């Protein structure tokens, strides 16, 4: 897998600037095109939150349109600022810039109006990787639906970045990677799609979480290590006793202890992973880990 088309979902908040900065850095590292997608939801997107009768109010419609305009203007300013900071040419639908001849990073700001989940699904399928910030509290749940759609409706790897401002601009650096492995299809796909990152890493750990009484399949783990060696990647296998924790919690805690720059893992069931990302005890663990996650469903 090569990375030549990056999609960054960006709502225009300060908490997403780390994800935006990472998207530009990835584009520079892989001489890729980064498309920054900003979606303005239609009033109908809020029916499930406020009710159909409320949404039909002209006052509510005007308020939504005003908020959409302010978000769009804020997002555009941030994107222009980061493009200039990274010295990456920025285009839009009226000024398409190609990187065929220069073989350098290029960027495009994409603004679309409509249903957030559908737009993210359609645009995400036309990318090699999707970058989005996690833990951005959205009272209207629109941003939440964008994250869920990216993970479960695109078939593409999603780089879920910790929320926060960008402290500095630097080339993408991911030298210490932890790879979660349970032998399942999702884990296998996540491993394959993370190969571009694994090949550039100085240190790779293969993490396997085991519950109480579960046997360790050392032969299967050795098979994974040999597969990675075929790609020039040398990994160290680590077995984790989950104990009273869930496997996800155990993996995240160990990845943090190992000072990992990235944790690669498969996204399992829809409802289970929705809880991991958006709420509940596991979300607390995600916040505590404070490391990027590369997910694939």
Predicted regions mapped to residue ranges:
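Structural beta-alpha unit
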Residues: 1, 50, 81-130, 230-263, ...
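Small/aliphatic-rich secondary-structure junction motif
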Residues: 1-61, 153, 172-240
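A short acidic, glycine-rich active-site loop
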Residues: 57-74
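Short secondary-structure boundary segments
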Residues: 38, 134, 266-268, 297
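Charged helix-capping and loop-helix junction motifs
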Residues: 144-146, 219-222, 252-253, 277-282
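Short, small-residue-enriched loops and turns at beta-alpha junctions
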Residues: 138-139, 167, 212-216, 242-245, ...
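Intrinsically disordered or low-complexity boundary/linker segments at protein termini
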Residues: 1-18, 90-104, 108, 120-207, ...
């Amino acid at each position: 897998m090569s990375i030549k088309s990056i999609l960054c979902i960006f709502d225009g908040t300060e908490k997403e600037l780390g994800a935006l900065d990472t998207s530009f850095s990835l584009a520079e590292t892989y001489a890729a095109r980064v498309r920054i997608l900003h979606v303005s939801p239609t009033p109908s997107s809020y029916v499930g939150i406020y009710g159909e009768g409320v949404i039909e109010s002209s006052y509510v419609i005007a308020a939504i349109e005003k908020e959409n305009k302010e978000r769009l203007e804020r997002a555009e300013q941030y994107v222009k600022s980061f493009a200039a900071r990274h010295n990456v040419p920025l285009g839009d639908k009226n000024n398409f810039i190609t990187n065929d001849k220069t073989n350098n990073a290029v960027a495009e700001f994409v603004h679309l109006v409509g249903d957030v989940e559908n737009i993210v699904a359609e645009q995400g399928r036309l990318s090699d990787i999707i970058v989005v910030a996690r833990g951005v509290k959205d009272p209207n749940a629109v941003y939440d639906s964008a994250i869920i759609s990216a993970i479960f409706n695109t078939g593409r790897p999603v780089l879920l970045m910790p929320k926060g401002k960008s402290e500095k601009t630097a080339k993408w650096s991911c030298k210490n990677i932890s790879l979660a492995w349970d032998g399942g299809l999702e884990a296998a796909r996540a491993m394959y799609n993370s190969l571009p990152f694994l090949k550039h890493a100085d240190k790779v750990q293969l993490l396997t979480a085991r519950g109480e009484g579960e046997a360790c399949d050392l032969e299967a783990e050795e098979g994974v290590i040999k597969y990675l060696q075929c790609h020039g990647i040398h990994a160290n296998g680590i077995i984790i006793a989950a104990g009273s924790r869930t496997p996800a919690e155990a993996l995240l805690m160990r990845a943090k202890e190992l000072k990992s720059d990235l944790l690669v893992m498969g996204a399992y069931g829809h409802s289970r992973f929705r809880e991991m990302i958006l709420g509940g005890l596991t979300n607390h663990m995600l916040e505590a880990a404070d490391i990027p996650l590369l997910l694939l469903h």
